Amino acid sequence: MPDIMPDDGLVLGLEGTAWNLSAALFGDDLVALHSSPYVPPKGGIHPREAAQHHASAMKEVVSRVLTEPERIRAVAFSQGPGLGPSLRTVATAARALSIALDVPLVGVNHCVAHVEIGRWATGFSDPIVLYASGANTQVLGYLNGRYRIFGETLDIGLGNGLDKFARSHDLPHPGGPAIERLAREGNYIELPYTVKGMDLAFSGLVSAAQESSAPLEDVCFGLQETAFAMCVEVTERALAHAGKDEVLLVGGVGANGRLQEMLRVMCEERGAAFAVPERTFLGDNGAMIAYTGKIMLEHGVVLPLDQSQIRPGYRADEVEVAWRTEPGEVFSIGPHEGGVARGAEAVVEIGEGNVIKRRTGKRYRYPALDRRLIAERTRAEARLIATARRAGVPTPVIRDITADTIVMERIKGEVLKYVTAPETIRLAGEAVGRLHGTGIVHGDLTTSNMIVRDGQCVLIDFGLASTSSEVESRGVDLHVFFQTLESTTENFQELKEAFVEGYTAVFPGAGEVLAREHEVELRGRYL
């Protein structure tokens, strides 16, 4: 739309969702950027104090970039997610500037802006995105007009977890750089590692690190190695599940050199491309709001003043991505009929009657952590597959087991992710209901780990499984599955209803578990 965004036009972007107030101008490239971060004298960020900082610094920050007001074609602002007081301060300023300059207002999702500035800065087109910041930790991918969330933190964001640990040891805010510096002098210590499918949980890890009596450098090393390995694992799982070939790291925690190194190694092993934007575009910044506002404006996405309320819980998957017209791809790699297949955690040799699943070492993980996970998961998988089968749950027959390898029956059928339909998803619901009825949670319920055969859905890949009759564990199990369906299908509600029908038909405790799953879903918000 050349009349809306002429060649010499600029978009003014205002970012202020949390601690950093930032303004930028974007045309064909970044023209100007100025920021004023709020640094608390002690402890963490207090929302009211951050908003007061933004209000007092707004005039100076905007005036530093707004040198040619006649060229402004729109004012973009971070509409959410974020801290309510900070969002309100920025939104008020954006509305005033929109009126004063007589230009449209564009409301930008903060999370999507991180992704879009990353795509612009790296040239990546359709990546799996690891978005790691203070309050947000998500794995995203694009499909048919929206960014879909493959997995996310179930409690606190990675950056906030690092800050919480840093405060407990009187380290400066933000805590990530200080932890990274101390970790260079440390040695590995074992800490809790919590991955649930493509979701993660950091609170137990952070609490254990805070309570550790080990030298601070060692705790920082163990904390980084554990938290980042969790992030890379779920990113690899999304990459393997979706069949994409690019990984993009965005968000403030993405500035950490060790996290970048681990992702780069993982991508090299998988033959995928990896990229991270320059540091300017990683933390919260006005450039990402201005750029995303620009491409939204070019596609006619503007916001009437009377609809410009802030959205503190605004999720990336709520945004209609009108500026991307391609459908996006998932499952571009077809099903394996034989030979060797590579999943996120293992190499699988598919024979005529047997499957040999061998867990391979991950070069991105610290060796001691890698050995521990391989041993624990191999033992647990074989034991729980056999236990579930004895209880009547459709699973493969276990033939043999070693320290890192399981030989099992080959299930000849269709992998569920290639044949998703209400009738097949109902079978999945029945299988999971029976599994939960035996006191086992799968831990990685995705459509990659289910095979439809002879009117049954066979459950495979029990590497993250555990024995539990807790409603919480079962609810998280279902949340992982529903998140997978929502991120990779267009008829999610219909499929979810079919799953619930099958699950409820065989499991008496289904109602309580489904209610808990909804609670878990609501936790996946800006924290």
From Swiss-Prot:
Binding of Fe cation, residues: 110, 114, 131, 284
PANTHER family from the UniProt entry: TRNA N6-ADENOSINE THREONYLCARBAMOYLTRANSFERASE
Family: In the N-terminal section; belongs to the KAE1 / TsaD family.
List of residues binding L-threonylcarbamoyladenylate: 131-135, 163, 176, 180, 256
Entry EC number(s): 2.3.1.234, 2.7.11.1
GO molecular function: ATP binding; iron ion binding; metalloendopeptidase activity; N(6)-L-threonylcarbamoyladenine synthase activity; protein serine kinase activity; protein serine/threonine kinase activity; protein serine/threonine/tyrosine kinase activity; zinc ion binding
NCBIfam families, A to Z: arch_bud32 (TIGR03724), arch_KAE1 (TIGR03722), gcp_kae1 (TIGR00329), PRK09605.1 (NF007174), PRK14879.1-3 (NF011462)
Superkingdom assignment: Archaea
Region entry Kae1, spans: 1-323
Protein name in the entry: Probable bifunctional tRNA threonylcarbamoyladenosine biosynthesis protein
Organism: Methanoculleus marisnigri (strain ATCC 35101 / DSM 1498 / JR1)
Locations listed in the record: Cytoplasm
